[in-house]
From Swiss-Prot:
HAMAP family: Lumazine_synth. The active site is at residue 89. One of its GO terms (biological process) is riboflavin biosynthetic process. The keyword Transferase applies. It comes from Buchnera aphidicola subsp. Schizaphis graminum (strain Sg). This is 6,7-dimethyl-8-ribityllumazine synthase. (2S)-2-hydroxy-3-oxobutyl phosphate binds at residues 86-87, 128. Gene3D superfamilies: Lumazine/riboflavin synthase. Its EC number is 2.5.1.78. One of its GO terms (molecular function) is 6,7-dimethyl-8-ribityllumazine synthase activity.
Amino acid sequence: MNIIQSGINVKNASITIIIARFNEFINKNLLSGAIDTLTRIGQIDKEKILTIYVPGTYEIPIVASYIANTNKYDAIIAIGTIIKGSTDHFKHIANDAYSNLSRISTKYFIPITMGILTTENIQQSIERSGTKMGNKGSEAALAALEMINIMKKLKKINN
């Protein structure tokens, strides 16, 4: 039986972080957590991290698609915050962002990890951006590091 598992140290990886400016007071903490994890735990040089700001979470997939198509990066981390309001807008933005990012990831065989919060209120967002519930940006970075290694191992098997 063959088993593929991986660690999180990927010194030579290039990663793109796409971050929404909307709800930036939350997203900046997610970004900080992601960069800290990539550099401190993943041992990635800051010069190998491209950070792109977009207006909102809805705009993340088009930039992710462009980056994935360049074939220059090993992973993409999506960072945004969608807080439920009084309309269905929340659901549409979240569903479109997640489904489009998933489609892009499988189309281009590039890990795209989700540091996108979908919360009921601002308090939940604050809790998930570095306080009581951890930092989802950091968790997305950890997932990206592991997935980079897994994808490298899969490519070796098939070559």
